[in-house]
Amino acid sequence: VAAQRLERGEILTGVHRAKHLVVDNSFSPNAFATYPHFFARVRTACPDVRTASIVHWAPVNDAILQGHADTILTNLTDDGVRDACIAALSADTADLIYLHFDDVDHAGHTFGFSPAVPQYIAAIEQEDARVGQIVAALQARPTYANEDWLVVVVSEHGGSGTSHGQNTPEQR
């Protein structure tokens, strides 16, 4: 997609693409120095925080988070992302973990972004199960009762047909 809306920039920086400047998968130009992503902000506020970025889609780490997370895992399957996150939680190696799953996006681009598409719904349900397994692993930590975790799940974009959608309520 030539001028694809890339919500990873919004998710990671908290500002609209008019400010962070990322409009396609080249991530160039960008204004991450002016509008740093949340890993940089957390590191500034809490220098000792242990961070991990575990992703299916490599450009998230390669173009945005490389050098900013203590642990970088890239090009994993969605099951691999889940498993690596559970391992990090079990080993207590990270205080902040960013995950990127991609199977729902693949299903949308392949079969269609619609609740009427069984493959799309199945991918959402599989992702929901993975998130549930991660939350269960988090809650199984021996120190969980004394910890204060925040789990945020967000979609980076909707779609129309098999393409990226527009900024409409139905496609968000």
Predicted region positions:
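Active-site-proximal alpha/beta segments of enzymes that process anionic O-linked groups
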Residues: 1-92
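Short, flexible, mixed-charge acidic loops at enzyme active sites
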Residues: 7-13, 111, 166-172
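Solvent-exposed coil/turn segments that connect beta secondary-structure elements
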Residues: 16, 102, 156-158
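A short beta-strand-to-alpha-helix junction
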Residues: 25-35, 118-125, 168-169
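Structural beta-sheet core signal
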Residues: 53, 99, 151-153
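Active-site His/acidic residue clusters
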Residues: 59-72, 86-133
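Aromatic- and acidic-residue-enriched segments that line the glycan-binding/catalytic groove
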Residues: 66-74, 163-172
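Metal-dependent active-site segment of extracytoplasmic phospho-/sulfohydrolases and closely related
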Residues: 126-167
